[in-house]
Amino acid sequence: EFTHEEMPNRVRMTTSCCQINCGGQGDIAINVQYVKPPKINHDLVANVCERPAVVARCPVAAIRPAMVNGKPSLEVDEKKCICCGACYPPCPPMQINGPDSTKLAIWVGGKHSNARSKPTFHKLVAANLPNNPPRWPEVADIVKRILHAYKEDGRAWERLGEWIERIGWPRFFEMTDLAFTRHQIDDWRGARSSLNAS
């Protein structure tokens, strides 16, 4: 359906295994979203993980050292855990990935280059989508809606994020028929200049 370059500009799609998104900023990013804290294999933690590094890696201080069955291990405070997945790379026995603990999220409008406008971070447009491999029909449907709207309304050489900035986020959600929820509100204190306020 979108095999020929008939779009206003090239669309860069990225995927990432977590919301940390080391894949970078893409026009459309499909990221795994974890919904449950990691399950810890206490038998392997002492031999595989550098525990102080794992504790330091957690952005919300939800991981602490512990002794389990007489072996050094780790424990997770499930009330603090934000399920970001930052603990898994330095400690594979802290398995966070699984069919019952992952969903998908779609972010749009990211850009690394400074051509025509400054580099931008992408923004969340759909969250908690079911992880239904191998075709991911719910994700494919939303990506197609975004691409159709962009193809119809985008100007020549205008990147996806530039198109959204031109038409505005409310119009983008109307054109793509996506639900705007509280998760899309940019309420970070340092982002006051980007808030949609009068």
Q: Which stretches of residues belong to each language-model region?
A:
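Peripheral terminal and linker regions in Fe-S/redox and tRNA-modifying enzymes
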Residues: E1-S198
